[in-house]
């Protein structure tokens, strides 16, 4: 099993947002592979022509013999350079913004033969470089003045009489820019090709150029976009690193863990203080108060167990994610592991376990007579109760399925034709239908509580239920299934009774008492005033129903709104109840359209139908008066107002309309359609936030906060909501278009059931919406009110005052074997084990006694292993964080391997970029990299940079269809990528393809011998300015003198 699935299955629902975000950290690790490729600029390699390569090899072989002499010259010049180092060395950062850019002529195009030049013009390979016929024994220095558009406006000689200005410099620079632009355009076309054209072919030629780009297709995470300027200001968007995300996650878990522990300990201290309080107050030592203290110890012990499991689960996740990251970056992973081990999550002596042990000892000391085994059995979670309830639920579901099948079989067996059924059967169907609606609604609510618990929705907090009472969704569902089974049993009895056709009509008439007695019995059970049969739930329902009736004169809370919605869907129940009263009053039990009650035009009928909607409107008005918010309170009021108007118009049309389509009925139809559309729109916006907050909502078109991550759940719910809202229109169309009036009892039952289903779905998602819209819902909690709060407060104040007086105190020593207490004077007295014997009843078989002589030493919860937040702890954390940042910054320098910001090197790059780079770009940040301490020609002849501002991200669906090859967008200029033997300026290649074994192999990197470097070095070292004999002739202000006087440039290669 994968850890993310294990984490999901073992989360505590109320702490769901407080766990490690494992997927988030894993994504940060995955981004490490991509960041090395897309953070910086792309560098493209332009291969040399065969003639140029042969010339370079020839020059390298000829210059090998002169290397030793050049090295000796370097050694002789070291002393002179060292003496003048302080005066002639140019500091880093000087002249970086100058428009006069001084560069070695090695970077400039040199004179070549006409034949070679023509070839270059034809092939597009006119990269500025050292051609055949160039002198290897001298270096020319040119100063180029470049304007903002990259055009050369002035060329002057600054290196003395031996400096020679090359004729083709302007032409060569323009040709270089043209090649770069063509390369960029070609790459754009290659990336943006259709996925069907997978193969570009290894011999793909760039149009108008002779060089080739290897690859059989490009899989890239960048898009080289053609633009007027291939280079521009570099803008880097900072991305969150793994170490930052890891530290944030560790801090989140650590703070939540310690905070919850301290809150639990504070509650335990209060419970411990109640033990001597109850011991000293015999009047308050009741079963209820003792149960309160015992239950408090139970709950806190279980809470600490959950907290310990929370810690262990998060630690497993952190260690697993570190094991993954260690394969990529072991140094930072080691520091992150050190940071984790320095937190309070990895404390050796866990205060949580110590507090759990102390709670168990105190519980055994004062409630089980020092019986640790009995205390363990009483204080641990009793899972057998839930298992028993689940067994009962399964048994009742099976019994209900059998009863339903039996009812259907018997009815159609005894009455194959509906006309053969008893004359009073419509009345019986009515009675059974209206009695089943509240039962089904209550059972659906029990099922919803189970789903809310699974989804982590805190319905106890939303419904404002008392937190000191244990609730179980399985228990609710068990009660619901009991009523469903009883209803089916009564229904079976009625079907068996009416199937006896030998009975007289009077006898069959009395059979109506069967469903009627069941309804009366259910109502009596609901209002039963005794504390039996789920009395808390029954009293809560009656209390909320009374508050609905009192609206708008009482404050309205969410439970009151919930109860009003239940009454809305029970409108059919209220309407049928008034008809039952009418039938018994007029002795018309046939329940037919020709009966008295159907023809009766009592005004009470529409009033009872619209009464639930009126209560709902009054609740909305009250909420608007309290909050002043038009949405959603007045919005909901308008919904209910539509229902009131349509019900009144329907009653008027049925009783006073002369025609089938009178103007009243037409008005009713129009208002009903408009009202249904408005209700549907209100449902979508209030419950699901559909099409709201387009600019700021990341989850658009749904609301931003959702409990269920699968969006299809909400869309399915919207579909059902639309169907339930327009059921009336379907029924109306069938009745108007056909002769069938849809008055069959079974159809009416399903029609009523659709109202129940709508109400259940509406409440389910409204509670879910209320849950996610509460700020920090999981941190909201209600403290359990003390049953003796004022008395306990007075007792603690008196105890504190006695402590402040510092009276002499005798230490008592307990003898657990003989229940005697020895005081300081040597006398003894017996402890009083007060029980609840003075009460005329006992609740359970458990020992309800509490030790009346509580010892303060036994009740001490302090221990040596406590969580600390001292200055030393914070300093250790900050020290590790600083170490992680230092290592990360060092690795960033080593990974990019870019050109340093030495003024002359930086100016060289500016010459070919045609602009002054942004101060935030990566190049000015790269100072004093070890690779830059080598002789300058090694870097100057290596590459020119393509600006990252021309890079764009390719959509993921396009990347998935472009296989095999990748354009790396990072300019990893390390020595193995540099073409140090070429005196030309080139685009260095990091176009790479993945081998079958997963290793990245460079397709265009050329390994040159050491002679390549020596060849370039010889050209610099053989320059007269470098010669000691001509040292005095060199202008001290020349750029070349500033370079070669640095000690590190004169070191032997």
UniProtKB/Swiss-Prot annotation:
Transmembrane segments: 391-411, 427-447, 476-496, 510-530, 561-581, 595-615, 630-652, 666-686, 712-732, 745-765
One GO MF term attached to the UniProt entry: phosphate transmembrane transporter activity
Bias (Polar residues): 95-112, 1023-1040
Composition bias, Acidic residues: 113-122, 842-853
Domain named EXS: residues: 596-798
CDD domains: SPX
A GO cellular component annotation in the UniProt record: plasma membrane
Start-end of Low complexity biased regions: 54-88
Keyword flag Transmembrane helix: yes
Domain called SPX: residue spans: 1-339
BP-aspect Gene Ontology terms: cellular response to phosphate starvation; phosphate ion transport
Subcellular localization, as worded in the UniProt entry: Membrane
Chain intervals for the UniProt region annotation (Disordered): 54-137, 799-871, 1023-1053
Family from the record: Belongs to the SYG1 (TC 2.A.94) family.
Record protein name field: SPX and EXS domain-containing protein 2
Natural source organism: Dictyostelium discoideum
């Amino acid at each position: 099993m994968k850890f993310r699935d294990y984490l999901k299955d073992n989360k505590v629902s109320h702490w769901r947002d407080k766990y490690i975000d494992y997927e988030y950290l894993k994504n940060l690790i995955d981004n490490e592979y991509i960041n090395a490729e897309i953070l910086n600029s792309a560098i493209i390699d332009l291969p040399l022509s065969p003639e140029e390569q042969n010339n370079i090899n020839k020059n390298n072989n000829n210059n090998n013999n002169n290397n030793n002499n050049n090295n000796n010259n370097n050694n002789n010049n070291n002393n002179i350079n060292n003496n003048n180092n302080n005066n002639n060395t140019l500091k880093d950062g000087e002249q970086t913004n100058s428009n006069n850019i001084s560069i070695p002529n090695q970077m400039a195009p040199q004179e070549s033969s006409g034949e070679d030049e023509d070839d270059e013009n034809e092939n597009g390979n006119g990269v500025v470089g050292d051609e055949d016929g160039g002198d290897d024994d001298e270096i020319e220095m040119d100063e180029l003045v470049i304007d903002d558009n990259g055009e050369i406006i002035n060329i002057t000689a600054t290196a003395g009489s031996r400096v020679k200005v090359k004729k083709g410099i302007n032409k060569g620079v323009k040709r270089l820019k043209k090649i770069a632009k063509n390369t960029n355009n070609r790459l754009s076309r290659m990336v943006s090709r259709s996925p069907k054209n997978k193969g570009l072919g290894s011999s793909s030629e760039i149009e108008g150029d002779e060089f080739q780009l290897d690859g059989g297709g490009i899989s890239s995470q960048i898009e080289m976009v053609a633009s007027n300027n291939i280079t521009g200001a570099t803008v880097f968007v900072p991305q969150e690193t793994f170490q930052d995300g890891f530290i944030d996650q560790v801090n989140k878990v650590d703070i939540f863990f310690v905070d919850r522990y301290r809150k639990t300990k504070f509650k335990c201290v209060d419970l411990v203080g109640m033990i001597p309080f109850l011991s000293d107050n015999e009047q308050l030592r009741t079963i209820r108060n003792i149960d309160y203290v015992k239950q408090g110890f139970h709950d806190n012990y279980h809470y600490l167990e959950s907290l310990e499991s929370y810690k262990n689960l998060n630690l497993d996740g952190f260690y697993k994610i570190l094991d993954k990251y260690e394969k990529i970056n072991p140094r930072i992973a080691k520091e992150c592991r050190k940071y984790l081990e320095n937190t309070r999550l990895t404390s050796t002596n866990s205060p949580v376990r110590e507090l759990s042990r102390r709670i168990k000892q105190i519980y055994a000391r004062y409630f089980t007579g020092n019986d640790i085994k009995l205390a363990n059995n009483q204080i641990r979670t009793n899972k057998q109760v839930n298992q028993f309830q689940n067994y009962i639920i399964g048994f009742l579901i099976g019994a209900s399925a059998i009863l339903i099948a039996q009812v259907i079989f018997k009815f159609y067996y005894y009455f194959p034709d509906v006309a053969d059924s008893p004359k009073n059967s419509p009345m019986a169907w009515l009675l059974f239908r209206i009695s089943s609606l509240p039962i089904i609604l209550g059972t659906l609510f029990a099922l919803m509580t189970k789903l809310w618990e699974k989804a982590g929705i805190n319905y106890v907090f939303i419904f404002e239920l008392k937190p000191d009472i244990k609730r179980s969704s399985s228990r609710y569902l068990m009660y619901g299934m009991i009523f469903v089974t009883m209803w089916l049993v009564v229904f079976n009895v009625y079907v068996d009774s009416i199937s006896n056709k030998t009975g007289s009509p009077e006898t069959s008439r009395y059979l109506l008492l069967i469903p009627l007695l069941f309804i009366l019995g259910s109502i009596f059970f609901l209002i039963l005033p005794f504390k039996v049969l789920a009395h808390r739930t029954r009293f809560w329902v009656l209390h909320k129903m009374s508050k609905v009736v009192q609206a708008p004169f009482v404050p309205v809370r969410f439970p009151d709104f919930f109860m009003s919605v239940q009454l809305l869907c029970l409108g059919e129940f209220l309407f049928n109840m008034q008809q039952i009263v009418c039938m018994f009053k007029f002795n018309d039990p046939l329940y037919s359209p020709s009966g008295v009650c159907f023809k009766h035009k009592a005004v009470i009928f529409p009033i009872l139908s619209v009464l639930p909607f009126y209560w709902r409107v009054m609740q909305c008005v009250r909420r608007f008066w309290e909050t002043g918010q038009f949405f959603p309170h007045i919005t909901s009021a308008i919904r209910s107002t539509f229902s009131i108007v349509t019900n009144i118009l329907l009653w008027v049309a049925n009783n006073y309309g002369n025609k089938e389509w009178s103007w009243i009925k037409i008005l009713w139809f129009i208002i009903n359609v408009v009202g249904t559309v408005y209700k549907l729109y209100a449902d979508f916006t209030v419950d699901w936030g559909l099409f709201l907050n387009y600019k700021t909502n990341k989850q658009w078109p749904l609301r931003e906060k959702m409990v269920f991550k699968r969006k299809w759940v909400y869309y399915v719910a919207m579909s059902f909501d639309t169907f339930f809202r327009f059921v009336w229109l379907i029924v109306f169309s069938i009745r108007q278009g056909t002769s069938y009036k849809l008055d069959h009892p079974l159809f009416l039952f399903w029609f009523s059931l659709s109202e129940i289903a709508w109400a259940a779905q509406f409440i389910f998602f409204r509670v879910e919406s209320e849950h996610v819209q509460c700020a920090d819902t999981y941190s909201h909690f209600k403290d359990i009110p003390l049953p003796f709060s004022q008395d306990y407060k007075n007792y603690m104040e008196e105890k504190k005052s006695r402590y402040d007086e510092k009276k002499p105190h005798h230490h008592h020593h307990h003898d657990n074997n003989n229940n005697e207490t020895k005081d300081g004077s040597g006398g003894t007295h017996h402890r009083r084990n007060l029980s609840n014997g003075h009460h005329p009843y006992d609740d359970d078989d458990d020992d309800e006694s509490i030790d009346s002589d509580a010892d303060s030493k036994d009740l001490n919860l302090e221990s040596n292993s406590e969580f600390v937040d001292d200055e030393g702890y914070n300093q250790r954390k900050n020290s590790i964080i600083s170490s992680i940042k230092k290592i990360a910054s060092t690795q960033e320098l080593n990974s990019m391997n870019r050109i340093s910001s030495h003024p002359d090197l930086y100016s060289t790059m500016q010459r070919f970029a045609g602009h002054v780079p942004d101060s935030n770009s990566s190049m000015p940040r790269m100072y004093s990299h070890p690779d830059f301490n080598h002789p300058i020609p090694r870097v100057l002849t290596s590459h020119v940079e393509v600006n990252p501002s021309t890079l764009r991200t390719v959509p993921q669906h396009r990347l998935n269809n472009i296989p095999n090859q990748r354009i790396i967008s990072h300019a990893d200029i390390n020595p193995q990528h540099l073409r140090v033997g070429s005196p030309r300026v080139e685009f260095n290649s990091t176009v790479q393809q993945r081998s079958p074994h997963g290793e990245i192999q460079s397709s265009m990197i050329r390994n040159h011998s050491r002679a390549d470097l020596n060849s370039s070095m010889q050209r610099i070292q053989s320059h007269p300015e470098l010669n000691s004999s001509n040292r005095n002739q060199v202008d001290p202000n020349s750029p070349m003198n500033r370079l070669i006087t640095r000690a590190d440039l004169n070191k032997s290669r």
